Swiss-Prot record:
Zn(2+) 1 binds at residues 71, 74, 97, 100. The keyword Transmembrane helix applies. The chain crosses the membrane at residues 145-165, 182-202. This is E3 ubiquitin-protein ligase MARCHF3. A zinc finger (RING-CH-type) spans 63-123. The modification Phosphoserine is found at residues 237, 243. Keywords: Cytoplasmic vesicle, Endocytosis, Endosome, Membrane, Metal-binding, Phosphoprotein, Transferase, Transmembrane, Transmembrane helix, Ubl conjugation pathway, Zinc, Zinc-finger.
Length: 253
């Protein structure tokens, strides 16, 4: 442990895709008081100096339960949801909520821990098509999807009626021996439907590609872990007492 002055804000764990490396934990005094208690910042960094996590904590000097285990993502305790220890991380970074971890794995599109690179057993379920239609992604993709749907609903009946009128006129011209006009109307019908089918195919393939990409990166992640990784409440109390004793020995400069 090392101590120094600092001014940091808590941040979410970043996505570290490099190889696993030894981590270094440092405790730094922030020089601020919360409810009359000093604060310190715990930083976890790799051996190459890359910052992995920063957590602002309050030094537990009055009550041993102020430093009970908390989720490393939302920094909340186990009052609303049980804490898990599903990977090989230890200490304050070893506990996490199931919902927080599932949301993180879904957002980052990964299946492993960013710190210890432990690979989780997960089940990925694709989200329904209706959800993509309601929220397809960025604003320009929403406008493109809405515009193509309006054009399709407007052009489809228009092209059908126009083609039927052209064919009907070509038949009438054939009855009156006006073959040139009949051939012109038939060619116009073929060109009209060719352009319509080409535009429909291109638009359909474009939106299918966007949907497949959205479906691949926006899956619902279900964490498959045994119940034994849950941290019981009595063990959480023991961890809190142990952390309080450990923090009382730390020197804040």
């Amino acid at each position: 442990m090392t101590t120094s002055r600092c001014s940091h804000l808590p941040e979410v764990l970043p996505d570290c895709t490099g190889s696993a490396a030894p981590v270094v934990k440092t405790v730094e005094d922030c020089g601020s008081l919360v409810n009359g208690q000093p604060q310190y910042v715990m930083q976890v960094s790799a051996k190459d100096g890359q910052l992995l996590s920063t957590v602002v904590r309050t030094l537990a000097t009055q009550s041993p339960f102020n430093d009970r285990p908390m989720c490393r993502i939302c920094h909340e305790g186990s009052s609303q949801e049980d804490l898990l220890s599903p990977c090989e991380c230890t200490g304050t970074l070893g506990t996490i909520h199931r919902s927080c971890l599932e949301h993180w794995l879904s957002s980052s599109n990964t299946s492993y821990c960013e710190l210890c690179h432990f690979r989780f057993a997960v089940e990925r379920k694709p989200r329904p098509l209706v959800e993509w239609l309601r929220n397809p992604g960025p604003q320009h993709e929403k406008r493109t999807l809405f515009g193509d749907m309006v054009c399709f609903l407007f052009i489809t009946p228009l092209a059908t009626i126009s083609g039927w009128l052209c064919l009907r006129g070509a038949v009438d011209h054939l009855h009156f021996s006006s073959r040139l006009e009949a051939v012109g109307l038939i060619a116009l019908t073929v060109a009209l439907f060719t352009i319509y089918l080409f535009w429909t195919l291109v638009s359909f393939r474009y939106h299918c590609r966007l949907y497949n990409e959205w479906r691949r990166t926006n899956q619902r992640v279900i964490l498959l872990i045994p119940k034994s990784v849950n941290i019981p409440s009595n063990q959480q109390s023991l961890l809190g007492l142990h952390s309080a004793k450990r923090n009382s020995k730390e020197t804040i400069v």
